[in-house]
Amino acid sequence: MDNNIRQLIGANQVAEILGISSSYAYKIIEELNQELEKAGYLTIRGKVDSLYLERRYFPTPDKIYTVNN
């Protein structure tokens, strides 16, 4: 995933990025979209913002450090 490009991605891309099945990817997309809707954002069913997915599933090294210490 390119860190500088924001795009909406579907279940097949989410599945590939996370190494999961596409059916499980749909569940993850639904959960992430519910979080975004709760925060007041509009969402598209079956798509999720790539940067939001990255932020939720791939923490930065400084966040990993603070959790481990």
Label every PLM stretch briefly.
Residues 1-2, 40:
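Short hydrophobic "helix-edge" motifs at membrane interfaces and signal-peptide entry regions
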